A protein has these predicted regions:
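Condensing-enzyme catalytic core mediating Claisen C-C bond formation in acyl metabolism
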Residues: 1-53, 150-217, 223-225, 241-247
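Solvent-exposed alpha-helices and their adjacent loops that cap or buttress functional pockets
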Residues: 7-11, 73-74, 96-99, 113, ...
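Conserved beta-ketoacyl condensing-enzyme motif
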Residues: 18, 53-111, 220-241
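Short beta-strand segments
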Residues: 19, 83-84, 133-139, 174
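Short glycine-enriched loops at secondary-structure junctions
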Residues: 24, 83-89, 139-140, 179
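Short acidic, glycine/serine/threonine-rich loops at helix termini
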Residues: 29-31, 92-94, 144-149, 238
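Short, well-ordered, mixed-charge alpha-helical segments that flank or form enzyme active sites
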Residues: 89-91, 141-146, 182, 192-196, ...
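Active-site-proximal alpha-helical scaffold in enzymes
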Residues: 108-135, 174
Length: 248
């Protein structure tokens, strides 16, 4: 069973494993240094749909379908799915996954949605309430611009501090199958006001220039990134950037 260690860390004692995963992206991402590692890439930002929001839903649908296919599973074999995106009412997830009829939990954590989904799915598998669970998220540059800044049709000038939101979707399948990358534990952070006043510079609030990694005396939770992530295809090129740290 799950065991709390310190104030923020939870140890998963039964063993939860990432049995399958996928990442699908749009044209800008496919042109980057990780382009060859993605499962699928698309040059059409609409993905054949008639709106950017529908295109994002399609990305999420394709990601989950790819993850299931790589695990030789159908939607009926999944007990629960934790999904989220950046749009109102999580419509990217709701419309993208509705045909699969998997028990659905909608999440909204902005850029932390994937981590939040992994935490929730891992906890469900650890507790035995799900044999197989999926965590998935998505975003789309064009739908995010409409949601948070200005629609592209408006033709507004982008400020230099405005980041470029990813067009893509990623999903992972978690189970106790005793194979794949193991999720040992997770550490939940706290709310910190970084006093970012530029409303266009949303990335600065999500990626602070420094992070406290020294553990509190009351929390000795140890979270290893390097030893697990280095084996994931798609993250192999980034493995040198990950080190084992103690988090508070």
């Amino acid at each position: 069973m799950a065991k709390r260690q310190g104030t923020r860390t939870v140890i998963l004692e039964n063993g939860v494993y990432i049995g399958s995963y996928s990442a699908v992206v749009g044209p800008k991402e496919s042109d980057g240094p990780l382009g060859k590692y993605f499962d699928k890439t698309f040059q059409d930002e609409f993905l054949g749909q008639d709106s950017f929001e529908k295109a994002e839903s399609k990305l999420q649908q394709i990601s989950v379908e790819t993850t299931l296919r790589k695990a030789d599973l159908t939607p009926d074999g999944v007990n629960i799915i934790f999904a989220g995106d950046l749009l109102n009412q999580c419509i990217g997830s709701a419309y993208g996954l509705r045909e699969m009829q998997i028990p659905f939990v909608g999440l909204y954590g902005a850029c932390s949605t994937m981590a939040l989904g992994l935490i929730m799915a891992s906890t469900a598998v650890e507790a035995g309430s799900a044999e197989k669970a999926i965590a998935v998220t998505s975003s789309h540059f064009c739908s995010s611009e409409r949601q948070f800044r200005f629609p592209l049709e408006y033709g507004g000038q982008r400020p230099p501090t405005a980041q470029w939101t990813v067009t893509g979707s990623g999903s992972v399948l978690l189970s106790q199958s005793l194979k794949g990358v193991k999720v040992n534990s997770y550490t939940i952070g706290k709310i910190v006001d970084l006093e970012i006043t530029d409303m266009n510079n949303m990335g600065a609030a999500m990626a602070p220039r420094d992070v406290k990694i020294r553990p509190y005396p009351i929390n000795e939770g140890l979270v290893f990134f390097y030893t697990q992530i280095q084996y994931l295809r798609g993250f192999r090129a980034l493995s040198n950037y990950f080190k084992p740290y103690k988090f508070h």
